[in-house]
Amino acid sequence: MVPSREALLGPGTTAIRCPKKLQNQNYKGHGLSKGKEREQRASIRFKTTLMNTLMDVLRHRPGWVEVKDEGEWDFYWCDVSWLRENFDHTYMDEHVRISHFRNHYELTRKNYMVKNLKRFRKQLEREAGKLEAAKCDFFPKTFEMPCEYHLFVEEFRKNPGITWIMKPVARSQGKGIFLFRRLKDIVDWRKDTRSSDDQKDDIPVENYVAQRYIENPYLIGGRKFDLRVYVLVMSVFAECLLWSGHRRQDVHLTNVAVQKTSPDYHPKKGCKWTLQRFRQYLASKHGPEAVETLFRDIDNIFVKSLQSVQKVIISDKHCFELYGYDILIDQDLKPWLLEVNASPSLTASSQEDYELKTCLLEDTLHVVDMEARLTGREKRVGGFDLMWNDGPVSREEGAPDLSGMGNFVTNTHLGCVNDRKKQLRQLFCSLQVQKKASS
């Protein structure tokens, strides 16, 4: 399955046109024959099992009608369990769109993500040299457990005293994670997994990754945080939120699902910043050049991670995907990729969060373009910017420099001022004029 030809990164974000195997060859075809076909339908039939902000956005979209049970649908925002059980034997007409790629887990399972990134780094070193391969050095040293246990022990003994973190490869929201510094802790864990496997031969041992813990995270007010950036494959969500740890440095897991278990958790108090606020804060502390370098490095994470799976993602024109990238910044302003989520939470934790996710989802639907209004030549749709088209995309000549930094030519606006409503009005008015002129 192929993500759409345009890997777009969300409001306040950047867009990526995916590498070849991740292209939707029919993206540009949304305009003519498909458009006429869709205009003949009275409505777009949608289905979803997610009762959150997404449902509100879908129900309020003009011309969209909800279908339930096994009724025919044109657009299905499904969960990954449905995909796993039904995708291979579900017939879909050409116009139908579904919200996941068949093997999205090549990027979203922690062990597969690391495996693909390591393989891609070696490929770059062979084909383009060490300098280019070094652009993949954005994930901590990681080992899959238990199959790489002996390699891990060798690395552990080379660097005594550092902290490691163990994560289940297929779980989310901070479940099953623990920190350790002693080899005895991992030996005990290994014994536990072996004994449970001996007792139940039909249940496989749950795989983990052992990952070097980032011990010098950037702190704001003494608090650790990570960034959640939404990436639509097809742009980077610019008004994405900065997930701030709710306690001081003793809170190691900055996942909002974990923060909600804190006794003093309050959804309206300082748990999240917008990325725009974060960027302004960093610029005041470190200057615009350092901040531009940081955000350029974050853009590199999106591009290289998608390129790492271009040979393994199954291409399908029916599919798109909204990924949630979790990124940690260290004290040297270096970004680290922690994980990629196939089902980022679309449930709002506050009114501000609800408004942000509403904009994110509305723009996602604009880019997926079930209504066939786009031409396929757009570089920006609402909060989404086209960032990659078999190579980096430059800003249009005469476009304002929203970063305020000058000489910023890449078509990316992560954390910049984002008047998406004005942009959408201008875009759809222009498309309407073009349509009338051609009819």
Curated annotation (Swiss-Prot):
Positions annotated to bind Mg(2+) 1: D326, E339
Sorted UniProt keywords: ATP-binding, Cell projection, Cilium, Cytoplasm, Cytoskeleton, Flagellum, Ligase, Magnesium, Metal-binding, Microtubule, Nucleotide-binding
Binding-site positions, L-glutamate: R248, K272, K357
Residues that bind Mg(2+) 2: E339, N341
Catalytic activity: (L-glutamyl)(n)-gamma-L-glutamyl-L-glutamyl-[protein] + L-glutamate + ATP = (L-glutamyl)(n+1)-gamma-L-glutamyl-L-glutamyl-[protein] + ADP + phosphate + H(+)
Major subcellular location class: cytoplasm
Protein name: Probable tubulin polyglutamylase TTLL9
Protein's organism: Homo sapiens (Human)
Gene: TTLL9
